[in-house]
C-alpha cells in the first residue's frame, strides 16, 4: 500500500493535525469547508480512483469538486447540517465563561434525565421478587423478614392480592405455600384489615384473572375458604362481601362457591386444609394438635428444656400465641398444672423463644374468650385475673396488657348476673328470629326478671340484627314497637341506643355498613313512636361531638326530615311480612269495608292480626274512624273496642290513630260536614273507656 506521506506536503500534514485536534470547535455550517480547501488535497489519479490512506466510502465529491468527509451515522458531517437537535459533544456542560451564559439554566442541569421514583411501583417490583424467592425456598421467616424490611406497610393489601394471584396460576404446592405464608404474616406483619382488603381486591379483579386462569372462580373460592378455616378472615367476610359485589360479577360467584361448596360441607375444615395436599407444611389444625401434645407431655414429665426444644422444632414462631393460649387454658383447667405452665412460659420468654408480642397476643386471645371458657371452667375469669399479675411481676408479660385489660374490664361488668343475662338474651333473640313469636319473647324476658338490663337487651337485639338479612332487621324494629307498648320505658330505649352508638366504631369493623343501618334503626324508632324526635337530641348530647355515633344521629335526622319519610322508612327492610305500605293500607280498607257491611268481629280481628304489622295498627284506627264518619255507622267503634280489649291494638297505637284523624279534621270537614262533632263524640268515648292516653284530650283541645 502506498504511503500517504508522498501525497501531502509537510505544511499540509501540520494543518491536518491541527484540524483534527480542533474539530470539536468547528462550525457545522455548510460554509465551513475552508479547512479542506486550504489543505488543497488533490487526487493523483485525476479523480478516478481512491487515494491511499483515505477510504473510498468516506469521501464524496461535491458539484464544486471538493471532498467532504461524511459521518457514518448518515446524518451529515462537516459541510452538512448534521442530525436534528444534534450536539457536537454528548458530554457538554454549561460554560460559565461563555458570553451567552444564563445562570437560570443551572436550575435544570441534572434534572432532565433524573428518574422519577414511584413508591408503589418500587413496592410492586420488590414484592414480586420476595414471592418468587419464597416459592423457590419455602422459607417463611425470610419472606416475613424481607417484607418487614421493605416497609411501605400501607401497600400490604397489594401484597396479599399479588401473592394469591401468583399462586393461583401455579401448582398446588405454591397454593399451599401461599396460604401458609398468609397465616404466618397475619397480625404480625400484615394487619387483619389489610388481609381483608387484599381479598376484596381479588374478588373485584377475578373477572380479569379468569381470562388467564380458567378455574379462577373455584381457586379463589378455595383460598377464601382456607383463609376462614385458618382464622385470618372472619366468617362474616362472606356476608359483607356479598353486600358490596354485584350479583352478576364473578366475585359474587366466588363467595357463593366458597360458602356452599367448601364451608357448608361436614368436616369442611379438614377437607379444605387437605385440598392442596398440605405441601411440605403442616396445617393449622395439625399444629394445634402438636402444641396440645407438647403441653400435655410437659405437664406429665416437667421437662422444660425438652418442651422448649419441641416448640422450637415446630418452626411456627408466628403461631406462638397459640402456645400461650393453650398453655393458659391448660393452667386454668388443671390448677395443679398452673405452676409448671407459668414456669414454661417464663422460660420461653427469657430464651426469646416466644416474643413479647406473641405473649401479649396469646393473653389477649384468652381474655377475649373468657365468657366461653366460663361455660367449661366456671372460675376461668378469677383464675386468669390471678395469673396476669404473676406474669407481669415475673417480667415475661408486658405491662401494657394490664392497662388494656383494666380498660376492657371497666366496659364489661363484673356482675355474673349480667353475663348470664347476656347469654340468655342471645338465645331468646335467636329463637325469636326463627319463630317470629313476640308474645313468647316478652314472656321469656319477664321470666328473666331483670328490667334494669333492658338497654343491654336492646343493644344485643340490634347488634345481632345488623349482621343478618333484612327480614331480621324488620323483625327487630317490629319487636321494638311491641316492647315499647308492653315492657320497656322510653328511658330504656334511649340508654340502649346510646350504648349502641358509643360502640358504633367497633361495630363498623365487623359490619361494613353499620353506621347507615343504625341510622335507619333510629329513624324507624321515631317513625314507630318508640322514640320522640326530641329524644334524638338527648342521645346526641351524651355522645362525643365528632364521633361516629354523633354522625349516625345526624343521618337519622336527615332520614326523618325527608319527604315521605314515614313510608320510605317503613319500607326500608321490606315492611314486616314483605308487603309495602300501600298494600297494607289496601288490605286494611278492604277488611273494614267487609266488617262494616255485616262482617264478624272475631274474623275482622283475625285479619288485622294476620297483617303482621302491629306497628302500623294506628292506620286501622284512623281508617275505622274516617269510615264511621263517612258511613254514619258507629258499628266500627265496636271493632276498635274489641281490638283494644284483646290487646291487638295498644293504647299508643290507638292514641296515634286518633291523633292523625284530629290533625286532618279540617280536610275531612270538606267532605263530611259534621266531622268535628263526630270526632269529639268518638274521642270522648275513647277517653271514657281508656283507649287513649289522658294527654290526648289536652293536645286535641289545643
From Swiss-Prot:
Gene3D superfamilies named among the record's database cross-references: 1.25.40.180
Cited PROSITE patterns: MI
Motif (Nuclear localization signal 1): 273-280
Function: Involved in target of rapamycin (TOR)-regulated translation control, especially under energy-deficient conditions.
Description of how the protein assembles with itself and partners: Binds to EIF4A1, S6K1 and S6K2. The association with ribosomes is modulated by cellular energy status and TOR activity.
Family statement: Belongs to the PDCD4 family.
UniProt-recorded name of the protein: MA3 DOMAIN-CONTAINING TRANSLATION REGULATORY FACTOR 1
